[in-house]
Amino acid sequence: MYGNLANKLILDAKRSSNLSETPLYQTDLVKSIIKETTDLNKDAEYLGEEQRIQEEDSENADEEKMKINQCQLFVTHLCMRRNKRCLLAYEKLRADKIDEFSWLNIDPITETGNTDPNKNKFGSTGNGSNSLVSNSANYTTQLNLDNLNHAEQEYYKNYQHLITNYKSNFADIDLSGDLDPPTNIFTDVRVLKNGGEVQTEYGVFNLIKDSQFYVRKSDVERLIQQGYLEEI
């Protein structure tokens, strides 16, 4: 049935909207929707030609048949428009997640495995600046480049370049910092997954799952972004 494939794509987008990582691009499903839309367009062209012929020969035309033809043409156009809207919504959601991740200055995952939790995109340690967001659970904190199609990889690369150029005009301002000042300098955190050793100004601690620490928030902000820690 027309529209079922687009519905599957939207359901996939809905499931991934609250994930902290960008899932695999649905290449086969997108291609199938495009093919379906192309077939619908051919049907619309045929129905449009039929309607034109009937209107030119209105004296001998069957009025009931004309109404059926108009209804078929209308429904066909609706299906095409819905497919287009679903495709655009899916692409926009993924583009928004790429944009969101780009501002966090975190290394994307280029292959299976974890990145170093103590390093951000520019190789600095975990005591970096305040983050764009304070609760990583609702934001994109992981980006596996293998899950992006070629166009998305190019988009990510160009968007990163755009951000870098923009930030260079405001060297004294942390544009990726949180707009709201922290309520407390120190905070309690819980480790969500195992990691390496973290060096801070006040000492060293190891990322061992389910362990808890009382640390300066600015020292672990990047780890919270990456999903290694959560505030409690």
Swiss-Prot record:
InterPro entries: GINS_A, GINS_bundle-like_dom_sf, GINS_Psf1, PSF1_C. The keyword GTP-binding does not apply. GO terms for biological process: DNA strand elongation involved in mitotic DNA replication; double-strand break repair via break-induced replication; mitotic DNA replication initiation. Pfam families: PSF1_C, Sld5. It is found in: Nucleus. GO terms for cellular component: CMG complex; GINS complex; nuclear replication fork. Coiled coil: none annotated. Keywords: DNA replication, Nucleus. The keyword Nucleus applies. It comes from the Eukaryota. PANTHER family: DNA REPLICATION COMPLEX GINS PROTEIN PSF1 (PTHR12914:SF2), PARTNER OF SLD5 (PTHR12914). The GINS complex plays an essential role in the initiation of DNA replication. Belongs to the GINS1/PSF1 family. Component of the GINS complex which is a heterotetramer of SLD5, PSF1, PSF2 and PSF3. This is DNA replication complex GINS protein PSF1. It comes from Debaryomyces hansenii (strain ATCC 36239 / CBS 767 / BCRC 21394 / JCM 1990 / NBRC 0083 / IGC 2968).
